[in-house]
Amino acid sequence: MMERDIRAVLDGLGLLVEDSKDAGKLQAMRNYAAVMALCADLRKSAEEYRGTRNITMVISELENHMAAVAGLFPTWDLPKDQHLVGAHAAISKLTMGTCFGQPT
């Protein structure tokens, strides 16, 4: 995946997280499904770069926070806002210049 494609995926993930802020249960599930699809693309791209394990751990962190927002992890008793902050933090980590060989 080219740098601009990765940037577009990361921007899309940010929009989905932001859209989940006021989303109802059904929309949160749709957003989660879209996040999972985009994260699958990122995982494929991560295989091309060093630090694959670290990148996939951050991708999993994002997926887990969005699953909690969608209500799939009822045992996670953090407020929804904290999961959204965690998801944004994971995206911020992925946008760092050290990920995916992006320029700083």
Residue ranges, per PLM feature:
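Amphipathic alpha-helical binding modules
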Residues: 63-104
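Amphipathic alpha-helical interaction modules
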Residues: 18-68
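Short, structured helix-loop boundary elements
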Residues: 3, 56-59, 81-84
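Short terminal alpha-helical segments
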Residues: 1-39, 88, 94, 98
